């Protein structure tokens, strides 16, 4: 049986939503016909890594992320985090919302849940799982990029060849392109590198980061 998502796919996030829902194929005729470069639009919809901006706490920062073209917007719902949000803010259907939890997922009404194990009160990124409707759909690898160890890249790339990987850890406008080239992840995630203070985003850095992901 072939499951086809027939309509309404105009953004990379919508294509990812169809994929995560179990679609084997999507119809994107109108989106391609309206695009100046159909081949470029097809690659945009189907193949490039998703860009996630996480640690959002303010409506103006959510708007800046969406205006920049972010595919995923993340809200940390762990009270102990310096980037804790009171709730997941509304997100249009052109993007996907992600609730970030430590220990177990609650019910935030988001498209995805990102659940980290609790270890001494800290998020342990390598053990994170992405859930859709309670079902695992991918992993988060939070790698220590500040350490000059090529093995990190190689191990992450090996995992990314077998399953959906969201890559995180020190990613920002200046580092995300190299990470994408080395690992070929399903998505990339940035938070602290896009801030002026915990939970307060720098809109220019958000834009530069998303542009680097799309480059």
For the regions a protein language model found, what residue spans apply to each?
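Catalytic cores of alpha/beta
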Residues: 5, 9-28, 58-68, 103-121, ...
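Catalytic beta/alpha-barrel core
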Residues: 5-6, 30-31, 52-57, 72-84, ...
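Short, aromatic/basic amphipathic alpha-helical patches
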Residues: 17, 87-92
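Glycine-rich phosphate-binding active-site loops on the catalytic face of alpha/beta enzymes
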Residues: 21-42, 70-82, 116-121, 144-146, ...
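Short domain-boundary/entry signatures in modular proteins, especially
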Residues: 40-52
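Short acidic, glycine/proline-enriched helix-loop-strand junctions
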Residues: 46, 90-96
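Internal alpha/beta domain cores that form substrate/cofactor-binding pockets in large enzymes
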Residues: 53-56, 139-143, 147, 152-160, ...
């Amino acid at each position: 049986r072939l499951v086809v998502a027939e309509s309404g796919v105009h953004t990379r996030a919508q294509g990812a939503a169809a994929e995560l829902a179990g679609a084997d194929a999507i119809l994107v005729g109108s989106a391609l016909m309206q695009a100046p470069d159909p081949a470029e639009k097809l690659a945009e919809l189907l193949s490039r890594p998703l860009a996630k901006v996480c640690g959002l706490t303010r409506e103006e920062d959510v708007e800046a992320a969406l205006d920049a073209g972010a595919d995923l917007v993340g809200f940390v719902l762990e009270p102990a985090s310096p980037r804790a949000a009171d709730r997941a803010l509304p997100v249009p259907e052109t993007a996907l919302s992600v609730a970030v939890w430590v220990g177990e997922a609650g019910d935030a009404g988001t498209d995805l849940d990102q659940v980290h194990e609790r270890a001494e009160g800290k998020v342990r990124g390598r053990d994170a799982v992405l859930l859709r409707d309670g079902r695992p759909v991918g992993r988060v690898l939070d790698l220590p990029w500040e350490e000059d160890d090529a093995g990190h890249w190689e191990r992450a790339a090996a995992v990314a060849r077998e399953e959906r990987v969201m890559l995180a850890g020190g990613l920002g406008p200046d580092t995300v392109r190299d990470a994408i080239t080395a690992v070929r992840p399903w998505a990339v995630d940035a938070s602290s590198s896009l801030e002026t203070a915990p939970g307060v985003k720098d809109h220019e850095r958000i834009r530069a980061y998303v542009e680097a992901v799309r480059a």
